[in-house]
């Protein structure tokens, strides 16, 4: 889960990373009050969106009074930045910037380890720096067990070209950023820029964080980081049900077991949809996972059926750990529960473990909206056809 800047700032502060004061505002009036409360000659009014490039888009503005902060907030709130609407701003105190650095720790999935990146040239787009001047960006592997101690922090800074005389001031911030990364089960902690002020202080003034949703069982506080106001209601409900669900823009609901199979199913539906009026496309990604019970299947189908955008549903299950009879029981249970509310046609393709039992359950159930299809391509085509008729 990507966090907003203000959320990252709060977690940094929690772990002792030196940060500037910042107050979140949702209206120009609140921004004015925040600027007055901070009481600094200059404040930055910063759009809170989970995407880069907000500065170039006009999403970061300087204000020199409370009234000016309100004007800046009014201009920023409601902006569209790369498809993200700005609903909040953070009013942050200004800083006397002498130097700007870059620092991050991330999960390097390819190498199966952590990676620390550091540069003396912060404040600019890091992708551009890495492409145009790769020698200016140090990349140092971090062992997940050993982590970052004083010696490792100095190694990272040395690789980035910081002389020994400058490292003493920066090492404490690096250690606290590592602590944040480790203790919050993050997959990314990034500060750009980390600054040195005119009086020699080191501050993290713009941070990004991504936390691992798979660690939510030991990070109960992370539930409070979910922005319910901007998250799709179906995704919120799916999370409460423990379902791996992503909302898409099409009208064919998709349910499968295993991320690979579901992604292949999305492709099949999109390809098949090109042959029908309106070009039906996938409405969602929903992986019920391995060993799914009838209850999980029923919850998934109930969720998809509640999506007003969905015109047909394609259930594609290859039984391994997941038994096809449990899937069939889940379909039956969901349709019985929905009763007259179940008005969307289902195309079901079952294969593998307990397929005969699963097909028998659905055949005996004999529900008029359920169509059994034997192959994936035929099922995708049928689901797209039904969606085009229902549109």
UniProtKB/Swiss-Prot annotation:
<dbReference type="InterPro" id="IPR005809">
    <property type="entry name" value="Succ_CoA_ligase-like_bsu"/>
</dbReference>
<dbReference type="Pfam" id="PF08442">
    <property type="entry name" value="ATP-grasp_2"/>
</dbReference>
<feature type="binding site">
    <location>
        <position position="257"/>
    </location>
    <ligand>
        <name>substrate</name>
    </ligand>
</feature>
<feature type="binding site">
    <location>
        <begin position="320"/>
        <end position="322"/>
    </location>
    <ligand>
        <name>substrate</name>
    </ligand>
</feature>
<dbReference type="InterPro" id="IPR016102">
    <property type="entry name" value="Succinyl-CoA_synth-like"/>
</dbReference>
<feature type="binding site">
    <location>
        <position position="192"/>
    </location>
    <ligand>
        <name>Mg(2+)</name>
    </ligand>
</feature>
<dbReference type="GO" id="GO:0006099">
    <property type="term" value="P:tricarboxylic acid cycle"/>
</dbReference>
<keyword id="KW-0547">Nucleotide-binding</keyword>
<dbReference type="InterPro" id="IPR011761">
    <property type="entry name" value="ATP-grasp"/>
</dbReference>
<feature type="binding site">
    <location>
        <position position="100"/>
    </location>
    <ligand>
        <name>ATP</name>
    </ligand>
</feature>
<dbReference type="GO" id="GO:0005829">
    <property type="term" value="C:cytosol"/>
</dbReference>
<dbReference type="InterPro" id="IPR017866">
    <property type="entry name" value="Succ-CoA_synthase_bsu_CS"/>
</dbReference>
<dbReference type="GO" id="GO:0042709">
    <property type="term" value="C:succinate-CoA ligase complex"/>
</dbReference>
<dbReference type="GO" id="GO:0006104">
    <property type="term" value="P:succinyl-CoA metabolic process"/>
</dbReference>
<comment type="function">
    <text>Succinyl-CoA synthetase functions in the citric acid cycle (TCA), coupling the hydrolysis of succinyl-CoA to the synthesis of either ATP or GTP and thus represents the only step of substrate-level phosphorylation in the TCA. The beta subunit provides nucleotide specificity of the enzyme and binds the substrate succinate, while the binding sites for coenzyme A and phosphate are found in the alpha subunit.</text>
</comment>
<comment type="pathway">
    <text>Carbohydrate metabolism; tricarboxylic acid cycle; succinate from succinyl-CoA (ligase route): step 1/1.</text>
</comment>
<feature type="binding site">
    <location>
        <position position="46"/>
    </location>
    <ligand>
        <name>ATP</name>
    </ligand>
</feature>
<dbReference type="GO" id="GO:0005524">
    <property type="term" value="F:ATP binding"/>
</dbReference>
<dbReference type="Pfam" id="PF00549">
    <property type="entry name" value="Ligase_CoA"/>
</dbReference>
<comment type="similarity">
    <text>Belongs to the succinate/malate CoA ligase beta subunit family.</text>
</comment>
<keyword id="KW-0067">ATP-binding</keyword>
<keyword id="KW-0436">Ligase</keyword>
<dbReference type="GO" id="GO:0000287">
    <property type="term" value="F:magnesium ion binding"/>
</dbReference>
<protein>
    <recommendedName>
        <fullName>Succinate--CoA ligase [ADP-forming] subunit beta</fullName>
        <ecNumber>6.2.1.5</ecNumber>
    </recommendedName>
</protein>
<feature type="binding site">
    <location>
        <begin position="53"/>
        <end position="55"/>
    </location>
    <ligand>
        <name>ATP</name>
    </ligand>
</feature>
<feature type="binding site">
    <location>
        <position position="206"/>
    </location>
    <ligand>
        <name>Mg(2+)</name>
    </ligand>
</feature>
<dbReference type="InterPro" id="IPR013815">
    <property type="entry name" value="ATP_grasp_subdomain_1"/>
</dbReference>
<feature type="domain" description="ATP-grasp">
    <location>
        <begin position="9"/>
        <end position="237"/>
    </location>
</feature>
<dbReference type="InterPro" id="IPR013650">
    <property type="entry name" value="ATP-grasp_succ-CoA_synth-type"/>
</dbReference>
<dbReference type="InterPro" id="IPR005811">
    <property type="entry name" value="SUCC_ACL_C"/>
</dbReference>
<comment type="subunit">
    <text>Heterotetramer of two alpha and two beta subunits.</text>
</comment>
<keyword id="KW-0460">Magnesium</keyword>
<keyword id="KW-0816">Tricarboxylic acid cycle</keyword>
<dbReference type="GO" id="GO:0004776">
    <property type="term" value="F:succinate-CoA ligase (GDP-forming) activity"/>
</dbReference>
<keyword id="KW-0479">Metal-binding</keyword>
<dbReference type="GO" id="GO:0004775">
    <property type="term" value="F:succinate-CoA ligase (ADP-forming) activity"/>
</dbReference>
<feature type="binding site">
    <location>
        <position position="95"/>
    </location>
    <ligand>
        <name>ATP</name>
    </ligand>
</feature>
């Amino acid at each position: 889960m990507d966090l907003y800047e203000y959320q990252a700032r709060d977690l940094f502060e929690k772990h002792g990373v030196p940060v500037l004061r910042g107050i979140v505002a949702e209206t120009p009036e609140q921004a004015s009050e925040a600027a007055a409360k901070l009481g600094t000659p200059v404040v930055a009014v910063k759009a809170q969106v989970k995407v880069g490039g907000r500065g170039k888009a006009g999403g970061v503005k300087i204000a020199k009074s409370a009234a000016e902060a309100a004007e800046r907030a009014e201009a920023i709130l409601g902006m569209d930045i790369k498809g993200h609407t700005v609903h909040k701003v953070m009013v942050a105190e200004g800083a006397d910037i002498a130097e700007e650095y870059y620092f991050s720790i991330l999960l390097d999935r390819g190498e199966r380890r952590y990676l620390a990146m550091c540069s003396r040239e912060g404040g600019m787009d890091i992708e551009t720096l890495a492409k145009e001047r790769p020698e200016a960006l140090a990349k140092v592997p971090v062992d997940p067990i050993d982590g970052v101690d004083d010696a490792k922090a100095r190694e990272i800074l040395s690789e980035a070209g910081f002389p020994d005389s400058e490292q003493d001031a920066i090492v404490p911030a690096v250690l606290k950023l590592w602590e944040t990364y480790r203790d919050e089960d993050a997959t990314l902690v990034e500060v750009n820029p980390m600054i040195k002020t005119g009086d020699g202080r080191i501050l993290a003034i713009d941070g990004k964080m991504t936390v691992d949703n798979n660690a939510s069982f030991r990070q109960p506080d992370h539930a409070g980081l979910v922005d319910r106001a901007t998250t799709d209601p179906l995704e919120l409900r799916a999370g409460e049900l423990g379902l791996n669900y992503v909302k898409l823009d099409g009208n064919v609901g998709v349910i499968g077991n295993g991320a690979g199979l579901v992604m292949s199913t999305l492709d099949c539906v999109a390809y098949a949809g090109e042959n029908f009026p309106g070009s039906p496309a996938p409405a969602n990604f929903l992986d019920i996972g391995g060993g799914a019970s009838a209850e999980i299947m029923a919850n998934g189908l109930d969720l998809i059926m509640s999506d007003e955008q969905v015109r047909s549903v394609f259930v594609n299950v290859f039984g391994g750990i997941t038994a096809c009879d449990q899937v069939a029981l889940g379909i039956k249970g969901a349709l019985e529960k929905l009763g007259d509310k179940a008005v969307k046609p289902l195309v079901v393709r079952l294969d593998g473990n307990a397929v005969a039992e699963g097909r028998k359950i659905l055949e005996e159930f004999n529900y008029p909206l359920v169509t059994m299809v034997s192959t994936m391509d035929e099922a995708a085509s049928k689901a797209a056809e039904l969606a085009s008729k229902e549109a």
